[in-house]
Amino acid sequence: EIAQCLVGSEMCIRDSTWSACKGVVSCAAGIALDEGLIRLDEKIVDIFPEYAPENPEGYLGDVTLENMLTMTTGLESSLFFCDWPERYTTPDWIRYFFENAKVIKKPGTEWLYSNFNTYMISCAIEKRAGVNLLEYLRNRFFEPLGIGNPDWTLCPKGHVHAANGLYVNIDEFTRYGQMILHKGNYNGKQLVPESYMKMATSNLVDNSAAGSPGNLYSGFGYGYQFVMNPEAGSYRSDGNYGQFCLAFPDKDAVVTVMSLEGDFQKIGNHLWTTVVPEL
């Protein structure tokens, strides 16, 4: 286990995990599936009939929760999120999705990263559970991991951002890493069904579009909100500004990094040239 923290900061200081918390939403989906609250093949229009158009355009009516988990919704574009201007003028993000999502490709056929996929998965769980995702996971997930009263940014309607906005410290982030390393098990307690975690952390879809020149670690596949590493069988949660939680089951190792580095590819490349070879 290797934990690297912010220079000049204390281990107890919480900071944003940015998109690395997408893996937490995936874990929530696994728990909700096990409890019978949702199904992978459920269509998003059926979960939110009060929002869905009567005659969905394109392939919108075919989009399932599994498509959203794998980022293969078929969207034309990623839609807004985080600090995009629309965030400040849009009071209802679920309504925005159904009014603006152009699903031009058959769901399940092509990967396109969109924070809205994660947000809608979370909202579906919240609707079925009757509480927001933070409360749903409090006793089922966060407390067993020793993550007490975590902070998660809310949208104007009170739903967690889901795709980002979860604040933890690096010690808590590392415990999350231990849990994903052991396929949902932490300290002998199975928090997320093992069968689900095996699927979630498998290479399910081609995300080579995420690769870029000079990037040593992206574009090697995608699972249920988890990103595949170049090394076979290893995977991660990662986020903007250099948040990394890397799991290497064959080495029984977790590497966690939290940073505020604008050029987060520099951190990723450093991990794969300096840290990973030493595991």
Predicted regions located by residue number:
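Single conserved hydrophobic/aromatic residue that forms the stacking wall/gate
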Residues: E1-G8, I13
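A small/polar active-site loop signature that marks catalytic segments
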Residues: G74-L154
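Soluble non-cytosolic domains of exported or imported proteins
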Residues: D15, S19, G23, I38, ...
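Active-site-proximal alpha-helical segments within enzyme catalytic domains
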Residues: N117-A124, N164-N185, Q243-S259
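Active-site helix/loop module of the DD-peptidase/beta-lactamase fold
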Residues: E35-T73, K102, A129-N164, V168
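Active-site Gly/Thr loop motif
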Residues: I147-N149, K198-V254
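Structured C-terminal helix/loop/strand segments within mature extracytoplasmic catalytic/sensor domains
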Residues: S237-L279
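Active-site SXXK
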Residues: S16-D41, M68, I121-I125, F173-M179
